[in-house]
Amino acid sequence: MLKTGKKFHYTAPANGYPEWNNNPEIFQLNRSKAHALLMPYQTVEEALKNDRKSSVYYQSLNGSWYFHFAENADGRVKNFFAPEFSYEKWDSISVPSHWQLQGYDYPQYTNVTYPWVENEELEPPFAPTKYNPVGQYVRTFTPKSEWKDQPVYISFQGVESAFYVWINGEFVGYSEDSFTPAEFDITSYLQEGENTIAVEVYRWSDASWLEDQDFWRMSGIFRDVYLYSTPQVHIYDFSVRSSLDNNYEDGELSVSADILNYFEHDTQDLTFEVMLYDANAQEVLQAPLQTNLSVSDQRTVSLRTHIKSPAKWSAESPNLYTLVLSLKNAAGSIIETESCKVGFRTFEIKNGLMTINGKRIVLRGVNRHEFDSVKGRAGITREDMIHDILLMKQHNINAVRTSHYPNDSVWYELCNEYGLYVIDETNLETHGTWTYLQEGEQKAVPGSKPEWKENVLDRCRSMYERDKNHPSIIIWSLGNESFGGENFQHMYTFFKEKDSTRLVHYEGIFHHRDYDASDIESTMYVKPADVERYALMNPKKPYILCEYSHAMGNSCGNLYKYWELFDQYPILQGGFIWDWKDQALQATAEDGTSYLAYGGDFGDTPNDGNFCGNGLIFADGTASPKIAEVKKCYQPVKWTAVDPAKGKFAVQNKHLFTNLNAYDFVWTVEKNGELVEKHASLLNVAPDGTDELTLSYPLYEQENETDEFVLTLSLRLSKDTAWASAGYEVAYEQFVLPAKAAMPSVKAAHPALTVDQNEQTLTVTGTNFTAIFDKRKGQFISYNYERTELLASGFRPNFWRAVTDNDLGNKLHERCQTWRQASLEQHVKKVTVQPQVDFVIISVELALDNSLASCYVTYTLYNDGEMKIEQSLAPSETMPEIPEIGMLFTMNAAFDSLTWYGRGPHENYWDRKTGAKLALHKGSVKEQVTPYLRPQECGNKTDVRWATITNDQGRGFLIKGLPTVELNALPYSPFELEAYDHFYKLPASDSVTVRVNYKQMGVGGDDSWQAKTHPNYTLYANRSYTNTFTLKPL
């Protein structure tokens, strides 16, 4: 039955435990049957607007509630729900919220380990009892007068993790599953005028064994709470199917609705009708679909029709219609209306591949937790969600996995509207109950344990029923990292029996093959070579990486390798980066400084530190440099050079449904970063098609032997869209063009150098500069140009970077410690000075602390002040890989202006530079610091031809690579960065640390706990290296 209409009669569990402890079979009491997200309206016009909160049938209970906190069940107020209980002196708390962020209890971040393990040793299904906080909420409300004699329900959109509800002192019900709605029929509990609601929430319950997601462990009423009423006869639920025919041309619309006669009064001659409206609110059907009916208690009705050539829905073109369902009385007057958005699309496996509307789909995806740095998961607003979606769309992301629980319903509506494919994931993760490589199910939950079967099926049902009508959802996921077992087969069967329009996904079968509960082969953090190996095995299932490119700290190296594979092998159909946003909470240090906190910062144990910092965007919602790489790798267009000298290039359109002529095509040529010419036109390349592009430009001539001409091809929005304005660049590619070589340049004549030296120092003087070299240190200790001192400390070989999170994960800081010591401890073995008329050569042989490598530095100082530095390193092949090879020096903090011609404008690395443009870039040194959660290597620039570091007067150094260098200029040294666990703890800097490198090893990113940087981006010790560049004073 859909209703009770009567008060619930409570019976205590037979085992003597409360519902929330040691009772996995009890996951709800008196909860209403799950249904699609709906809200009754009084008119068609209201239904078309579909503004639920403006409906006369809606009443919010968000706001201030009275609140009592207890550390465990024994400390709670036992009779707080009684009508005579006085709660007026209790604290107040805002709903929705996490009580941990409102001054009670503490937030706790842990990944795999269950949060209570250090307080209590437990086995499932027992819940903690020693420390298991309980939040008790009370408030009053007066139902709207218009609701008299109508059914009334209360809807909790999200409560973590288990809760009881009382109305006016009477027990209404109980529910678990933190991330799907729990609704209760409270009609029979209400009284005239003011009513009192009491809610008791448990931080942990036996259901918490199913909610071991990698996130902050927080609790409370964290999503909207509201009342809603309905007419006595109303549409309780409805299901919409809007697929395409076999030719993907015409649409098939079918609607099924459950009609409920709540009070079972006689009803005759009702009419149920359906009308479809287009994006302009114009009727699509010539006449409404309708059927006449009478309803004594409840009834299901179905209607269907054929739609000629509807506008199709896809992430590229998210064309939506509005379906309005109306229930009318015998006189033809509206009793109520409901509505939802409809998108005509067909998602299926065809010829072994996942397809959307007949075309092979590639999921350019990301995993997303619901998170806000101030609110946690609580009260995430529509504006918060739109902010995320705009950034996703702007960076060519077309798919999102709701890791690892159903999101707020508004999220799916926005994905429908803006165009994102969704993997909707069941609220299930039990990572802490099993270990990798275990052979059997052992202690894995839910496994094949019968006591958990109905619990997990209820989670599937709650998600499915709420979300079934969203066109953006293409895949149901059974959960995350919960091993395998028969219960997953039951879950799989549930979805397959309910829904033929979507696929079912579960990565866990990779670890336990006894139950094949997935339509898709899915893995996590598999290296590109292993992904390719699957493609070569003649596989039967399409493949995705449901998690890959672990974006912890400075990461996402070699992302392009995966996308080369997705292009090469049709069976490989994309992946979802882990993850979208750093989960860091705003906190205040003892001195009042605001900072972003991670695990352990609240005294929480156990914790997993900054492992919550895996985002493509920072916790404050701003973009990190990593997402620029994602945008480039995910871009829907590919250009390749055919014959650049003749202006010939190949164009591949990766869109499935969009011709490239929908965009503006702009191409430019720049000389050393300065614009030479710019042209705009259109590219006419069919969806999923290729063509040849011919551009007309001359053979450019160099004026200087270092001149460089760069062609940039750019695809830009031709008009405003919902997610970006006209002119926004969607895709680009760059090519260095061939040019007619210039004659070698000859240095201008300058007066001869003056060289003075003694045992300790060497002083070189030119027309407007003086440089002092310390022979004992083997360094220049001063470089004075035009009465401005440019050096704070001299040039020294450096082989170390501030360890990244990936470095820590693969133990580089232990394995390669010798190179850290070699950077800090260097001894001069020999200094040779060779004065000439126009230059002086100073050769330094250094003994490094590790004694297994030979290091030489040669300085050639010319009479115009320019200095050429040649660094060579000959390591022993028995030594570990080298984090970086270069020279480090410092300047005064006043030299804060940085200009470079190389890749940028954001930081980039040997294995993460695809999305960084070769151009002329400018910024302050301070701006080069990337605020990762834990201070680490950041700010690097690759393929740098030249750079200047100057003060306000324009004094400083011009650095030129021979031919290129990597450059890093920050207010901190690598050793300072890695000495602190938060950026706010770093002391104010009085210098600029400049590192001019031959190379720095790549940042990696296959995972952040074991994977090393790929070999082709690693500086191995089995060869010699040379780093050459020049510095010239400005």
From Swiss-Prot:
Keywords: Glycosidase, Hydrolase. It catalyses: Hydrolysis of terminal non-reducing beta-D-galactose residues in beta-D-galactosides. PROSITE patterns: GLYCOSYL_HYDROL_F2_1, GLYCOSYL_HYDROL_F2_2. One of its GO terms (cellular component) is beta-galactosidase complex. The active site is at E481 (proton donor), E547 (nucleophile). The keyword Glycoprotein does not apply. SMART domains: Bgal_small_N. GO terms for molecular function: beta-galactosidase activity; carbohydrate binding. GO terms for biological process: lactose catabolic process. PANTHER family: BETA-GALACTOSIDASE. Belongs to the glycosyl hydrolase 2 family. This is Beta-galactosidase. It comes from Priestia megaterium (strain DSM 319 / IMG 1521) (Bacillus megaterium).
